[in-house]
UniProtKB/Swiss-Prot annotation:
GO terms for biological process: NAD biosynthetic process. PANTHER family: NH 3 /GLUTAMINE-DEPENDENT NAD + SYNTHETASE, NH(3)-DEPENDENT NAD(+) SYNTHETASE. ATP binds at residues 50-57, 167, 196, 218. InterPro entries: NAD/GMP_synthase, NAD_synthase, NH(3)-dep_NAD(+)_synth, Rossmann-like_a/b/a_fold. Keywords: ATP-binding, Ligase, Magnesium, Metal-binding, NAD, Nucleotide-binding. The gene is nadE. Its EC number is 6.3.1.5. It holds the Pfam family NAD_synthase. One of its GO terms (cellular component) is cytoplasm. It catalyses: deamido-NAD(+) + NH4(+) + ATP = AMP + diphosphate + NAD(+) + H(+). This is NH(3)-dependent NAD(+) synthetase. Pathway: Cofactor biosynthesis; NAD(+) biosynthesis; NAD(+) from deamido-NAD(+) (ammonia route): step 1/1.
Length: 275
């Protein structure tokens, strides 16, 4: 393992590969326990998570639903619940898969909040967009969509006195592949430290369909590049990112891209600067 790989893996608290099924099961139990502890320590009863249709929110949702189910069983308190929220922007191209994810999770409650009108209303009021290239406006509004989705989740959580779950994991964190104060904002991040193939492995552990587990990851935030795969944005594959984080050899160009991107996005992984 290169010293830089070791340093980054330590900073992101990357978990080692699952040695076997027993190790995977133990990690699932640990993360479910973490969610339960967070909820009980906050003295709250509700968890809220936006379900996009990707494997990250699918896996986080499965962990959350198991956590509240176990809390109901162990405490006898039926008020513990998990709310899955669909947050489409106007019409989502992969809505069928998003609904399939919600159906498989079987959350206690499901809500749908369309963020389209909110994002468009805000965009119409932003004079700073005047004269900007369409591509720049589209990119900024992509981040606005992510932030509006988190606003919606916190609104639901506020109404039900709950905590918001995030879906960030090590393979996204190392690339800074999240919107600051958007999908990067949450009360608890139960996938933290996992690489992408571990997130998929946990989804499989729950019996999730392969069509959802292996769905091509996409943030799908930009109107001018609908459904753009994450890996096209990264310039490297998730397999290469996972290998890098686990200290395995990767091609020279992938090593360079990951290291440079990690350094460039450091501000996204830190709290606001203060004097």
């Amino acid at each position: 393992m290169h010293a830089v790989q070791r340093q980054i893996a330590e900073q992101l608290k990357v978990q080692p590969p699952f040695a076997d099924q027993n190790a995977l099961q133990a990690e699932v139990a640990r993360r479910v326990g973490f969610i339960k502890d967070c909820l009980q320590n906050a003295r709250l009863k509700t968890l809220v998570l936006g379900i996009s249709g990707g494997v990250d929110s699918l896996t986080a949702g499965l962990l959350a639903q198991r956590a509240v189910k176990e809390l109901r069983e162990s405490t006898g308190d039926t008020r513990y619940r998990f709310i899955a929220v669909r947050l489409p922007y106007v019409v989502q191209a992969d809505e069928h898969e998003a609904q399939a994810s919600v159906d498989f999770i079987e959350p206690d409650e499901r809500h749908t909040i369309n963020i389209g009108s909110s994002v468009k209303a805000l965009a119409a009021e932003v004079k700073a967009f005047d004269g900007l290239p369409a591509s720049s406006v589209d990119f900024v509004l992509g981040n606005t969509k992510a932030r509006m989705r988190m606003v919606a989740q916190y609104t639901v959580a506020g109404a039900y006195q709950g905590l918001v779950i995030g879906t960030d994991h090590a393979a996204e964190a190392v690339m800074g592949f999240f919107t600051k104060f958007g999908d990067g904002a949450c009360d608890l991040a139960p996938l933290s430290g996992l690489v992408k193939n571990q997130v998929r492995a946990i989804a499989r552990h729950f019996g999730a369909p392969e069509s959802l587990v292996e769905k091509v990851p996409t943030a799908d935030l930009e109107d001018l590049s609908p459904g753009k795969p994450d890996e096209a944005s990264h310039g490297v594959t998730y397999a290469e990112i996972d290998a890098f984080l686990h200290g395995e050899p990767v091609r020279e160009e992938a090593f360079r891209i990951i290291c440079e991107t990690y350094a460039k996005t450091q501000h996204k992984r830190e709290l606001p600067y203060a004097p």
